[in-house]
Amino acid sequence: MTIDRTYPIFTVRWLAVHGLAIPTVFFLGSISAMQFIQR
């Protein structure tokens, strides 16, 4: 595999990972905050 033209796959993968990880962290943080506020 050449080092040329691996950037689209890398970019799509990076965007997919961060696009899923950031809302997941925000979602877990909001859930923990709601449970902490309810008690």
Curated annotation (Swiss-Prot):
Localisation per UniProt entry: Plastid membrane
GO MF, one annotated term: iron ion binding
Binding site for heme: H18
Bilayer topology term: Single-pass membrane protein
Alphabetical keyword list: Electron transport, Heme, Iron, Membrane, Metal-binding, Photosynthesis, Photosystem II, Plastid, Transmembrane, Transmembrane helix, Transport
Keyword Membrane: yes
Family affiliation: Belongs to the PsbE/PsbF family.
Subunit-structure text: Heterodimer of an alpha subunit and a beta subunit. PSII is composed of 1 copy each of membrane proteins PsbA, PsbB, PsbC, PsbD, PsbE, PsbF, PsbH, PsbI, PsbJ, PsbK, PsbL, PsbM, PsbT, PsbX, PsbY, PsbZ, Psb30/Ycf12, at least 3 peripheral proteins of the oxygen-evolving complex and a large number of cofactors. It forms dimeric complexes.
Function: This b-type cytochrome is tightly associated with the reaction center of photosystem II (PSII). PSII is a light-driven water:plastoquinone oxidoreductase that uses light energy to abstract electrons from H(2)O, generating O(2) and a proton gradient subsequently used for ATP formation. It consists of a core antenna complex that captures photons, and an electron transfer chain that converts photonic excitation into a charge separation.
Name listed for the protein in its UniProt record: Cytochrome b559 subunit beta
Species this chain originates from: Cuscuta gronovii
